[in-house]
Amino acid sequence: AEQMFAALVGDRAYPVSSEFWTQLLELPLTQQWPRDRVLQACHAFAQNNYHTKHLAKILIHLVWCLQECTSASSVSSSVYRKAINAAYISSIFLKFIIENAKADNWQELCLDIDKDEKGLENIPSDQSVEYFLMKGVLNYIGSVDVSPESCYLHHELLNLMLVLMSTQLCSGPSPEPKDVHPFIDAAMLQDSSIVASVVQKLLLNFVRRPQIPSNGSHPVFSDDGGPGVLQRVGSAAANFVLLPYYTFNYFVSASAEGATSQLADNSLLVLLILIHYRKCISMNESIPTDSVYMSDSNTNVKDAPAFHENPYCKALNNAKDIQFDHADVEGNAQNGPVVRLSFASLFDALGTCLKDESSVLLLYSLVHGNCDFQEYVLVRTDLDTLLMPILEMLYNASRKTSNQIYMLLIILLILSQDSTFNASVHKLVLPSVPWYQERLMHQTSLGSLMVVVLIRTIKYNLSKLRDVYLHTNCLAILANMGPHAHRLSAYASQRLVSLFDMLSRKYAKLAELKNDKALKVTSDQMEADIISDDTVLYCYLAS
């Protein structure tokens, strides 16, 4: 194994048709390397890859292995081993190159391989290596079910996807036309059938939460349970290549209670990255009308950045409940394949995992973009399944960032725009609220609890964050709920009176300041800040 890896990172270029690749990928990979040698190997691979093109070649072999896994009726363990090793080796060296790249066009990847080379006859001449790779990986993820035999390969492919799409993190906070992300851009160009199958399979992985067999053995680990050479490479590289995984940690920093599934978590993370990717349209770019990757007609290019249409986001927004008849789905004149899954199972899975931030983002994406799922949520009689975790997180707002609080409030704001929802929450009685510390709450309605928690969030924001937009969202939710309030608990009514008392005093203070002729334009800056923070409260009370 050591000699094979020395050849892989060395300066001798092996043709893609060489037996070297088969021998490398069939190794059990049980030897361990010290950290300094691992780093030396990573640097050598990145430097020699300019002329060996070994990265592109191993990615091509990965696709060939995946094609063999997909087409064969029964897949041998050696084929799985080759595919897993190819995915794992690729992800490690890709991660290192991406983190240390100096150019934003990713020339260090050296993916421009000569298509006339022997052995590359099966690769279409008009397809780039990155397109060929993404098509192979996405086709496997979307077409092959997770099983005890394939779960390790699915796991490595999802990890590889995270690395491939991490090039975004080397760009600025906002997309620009000059941004180049070769792999995720190639993913956006895939056929609609592949897109729909990938979105559906990633959602099903999240819902079903498949577990890796406890008695299984991962080919990249040695027989004694210790880490093999690739695991050693991965752990060492992680100390230097922090950007992709640690930045994506925004989505997955909070782990849900109960049984966890790495496959489910990674599937959700990959799905979120795919559906929220935005690529700017260049001012000089010509977009064909028959392209899958089209501009958004609602965006004015002159006034704001225009983005290509995201096919994965579109597939999620058009997803249908599996209980609908196929004729109903076809009658909606959907273009192309439609993602179909059980909304009931998705609803239950979200309710179980909502303490995890990535699940909150998925729920927001669904209720904001998918009208069918939003309607399904609104007609459910067990709304506490979703609302209780959200309210508990708002109750613990001091442990959350303002962005996380925003996401929770926007979900409530969207739902509270429906009169049926507002009426339903007051009819649903909760036997107890164990996480509410200030007082015991028995036999209180879900609507009363929402009022209490929202008012508590407002007061916390006034004392700590002083964010006017949080005021706006909280008060807007209360305003939506107001006409449908029914049988509020005594405690909720008391909190409403307390809120009105606080706001009325602030209103009086603001009115006095406004009407005070002695108030000068050069008043103290701190006082001006107070006026700015409380203006939204003044507007709400004045209206």
Task: Kindly give the residue locations of the regions a language model identified.
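N-terminal alpha-helical scaffolding segments that mark the starts
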Residues: 1-87, 95-103
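Alpha-helical repeat/alpha-solenoid scaffolds of the HEAT/ARM/MIF4G superfamily
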Residues: 1-9, 15, 22, 42, ...
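Alpha-helical interaction elements in eukaryotic regulators
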Residues: 51, 55-58, 82, 86, ...
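Short amphipathic alpha-helical segments and their helix-coil junctions
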Residues: 55-74, 136-143, 239-253, 387-394, ...
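General structural signal for alpha-helix termini and helix-helix connectors
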Residues: 72, 143-146, 372, 396, ...
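Eukaryotic scaffolding regions of large macromolecular assemblies
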Residues: 391, 401-543
